[in-house]
Amino acid sequence: MNLSLPLHAYLLVAFGSGLGGAARLWVSTLVSRGTGTAFPWGTLAVNVAGCLIVGIMAALFEPASPLHVRQDLRVLLVVGLLGGFTTFSAFSLETLLLIQRGAVAAATAYVVASVALGLLAASAAYMSMAAALR
């Protein structure tokens, strides 16, 4: 199986990721200015917005969609833009697809494992780095 992609696909992802990352910073900062930083409202807003957008895009980009969206546009917007904006959108879409396929147990395990392992990784990395900096 050949998994190589053409150079333009990588360039589309890079461009979209840059825009998505800048958008994430802007939205998160804007929300945090209005709500404060005691709770990560900015990040929550970005993650929920990303999930909303990926849901819309997934529906629009379905093979049965009358739009007939090119693969390049999907790569730019979903992998690049939303990948830069938030990877939580991909996580949510993957969970939704598992549920739609009837794999509710797998979807549940994926959610629990993603959250638990994400928190564990963040905690371990934070504590390790804090200890190394002392």
Name the predicted role of every residue range.
Residues 1-134:
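Membrane-interface helix-loop junctions in multi-pass transporters/channels
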